[in-house]
């Protein structure tokens, strides 16, 4: 399933993203959206970033570049 950042830009693995709350820049590693509705995929913490130990909701991210 496609996921989108807070500005409705499509997100895919390998893209640089910024965490909106902190301004930290990281790389999207993977998104676990199996068995989620489109609304859940956008708002649940299902995205894993390369250098972070936390999961993020796509709506918390901003795609860079």
Residue spans for each PLM region:
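Intrinsically disordered, low-complexity, charged/polar segments
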Residues: 43-65
């Amino acid at each position: 399933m496609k996921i989108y950042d807070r500005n409705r830009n499509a997100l895919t693995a390998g893209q640089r993203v910024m965490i909106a709350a902190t301004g930290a820049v990281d790389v999207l590693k993977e998104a676990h959206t199996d068995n989620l509705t489109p609304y859940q995929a956008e708002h649940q913490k299902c995205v894993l970033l390369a250098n972070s130990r936390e999961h993020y909701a796509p709506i918390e991210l901003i795609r860079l570049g």
